[in-house]
């Protein structure tokens, strides 16, 4: 990249300070690097945060740290009975891991289009799928897997009602939605299980990692055992209790999905900054919304109760432009603005196309319409107002130069 093309506004940068560095060094010097005391403390503190909106002491959130959202989704689906001969319902407008986790377990995926005016799965269309399946008994559906795209929370009231009616589990893919506080509690605590991501670009990061939350002790127990090889004892217990470390049982063919203390140390510091990070994200989003409110070729992103503003999904009114989304993105990058695209619908990928001839953009028009219009703009806590204004000005400049009228 030449000097003139260096990005003035990076798409994303993690907000890491000396506090996180000191926490990591402390773990390194402790002599215990893998999953142990620090991870247990991180899990407790995360649970305390999520429980802060709950009144029922009998329905408290249990948190289990994992090495990625993907790992957490596999644990969650496995605990909910997703396996060969069963199916889940989810959206094609998501990162591939949401659906791939079901395939790893041998299950089928029934895709449901998104709402016309948002990026989230359409609860009314979920209902249509369930009504039809009740007639045909074509699939043994075990779970609905809503994805809170960009931190904008799905219609959980309707989804939970459907789950109760059809005796299904709800597994929230909450990779984008921390902290999304709603009148039903935090996103990720509304369904049977919620799975968060702590990837480098997420609102809370550990570099790589995630957290699984549930209020069901039995589900928690199953996931805890499966998280670490199916052992009936944790690593910390094996090496800190009087009982010999080699005395354990393997009760199931588990996975290796644990989060080490080094990464949990970062997470504990980040968790303390959650509210500050959220306010900064909300501030940048408000600057964008205000800057684009009178721009006819830009549509402001949907905003729900509890929006975490993980991403700012700018939708282009292509009818007002002479260029398409890809060219608009290219020109933004030429102007020094880092951009991305969330997400490429899964029906554009060869693996998923080859599984089902009917899995096409024509059968998921809302997802396709959002895809061809959307550009993800920079949004991160340490962004300055100047960076936001540079982004707004670049969008307006490019749109004005390429206006159709």
Question: Regions from the language model: what does each represent?
Answer:
Residues 89, 110, 170-171, 195, ...:
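Structural detector of well-ordered beta-strand residues that form the stable sheet scaffold
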Residues 32-87, 101-103, 111, 136:
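Phosphate-binding glycine-rich loop
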Residues 39-45, 51-52, 56-61, 113, ...:
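PLP-dependent aminotransferase class I/II
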Residues 78-165, 169-174, 181:
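PLP-dependent aminotransferase-like
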